[in-house]
Amino acid sequence: MGTPAPAPTEGATVVTIVHAPACHFCADAQRTLAELARDFPLRVELLDWAEPRGERLVRDHRAPMYPLVLLDGVLFSSGRLPRRKLARLLATRVATVGA
């Protein structure tokens, strides 16, 4: 059937990236997430678009561009990763958990 989604790590946001070969937006998203992981609790899961689960996620979310990015299983973006929007969302999540 395919690889199941990872279970969230306590307090960490699970970020799933479905990437494609030679995708510069995909490489940029991975670099951005590595930087954000220094400030926020993240668990990053990389899936190739050709893997059964990657294909299913792209089909289910009708992603027109790569990378497809999900946060805790919910669609966040497709194509260029909106860095500031993601950082604001992660900051809000951390503040909410810490409150």
Language model: regions and residue ranges:
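Structural micro-motif
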Residues: 60-69
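Non-catalytic, surface beta->alpha helical segment in thiol-disulfide oxidoreductase systems
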Residues: 71-99
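Local sequence-structure signature of Cys/Sec-based thiol-disulfide redox active-site neighborhoods
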Residues: 2-39
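Thiol-based oxidoreductase modules, predominantly thioredoxin-like and allied folds used
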Residues: 42-54
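A short, acidic/glycine-rich surface segment
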Residues: 2-3, 53-56
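Generic recognition of short, well-ordered alpha-helical segments
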Residues: 27-31, 56, 81
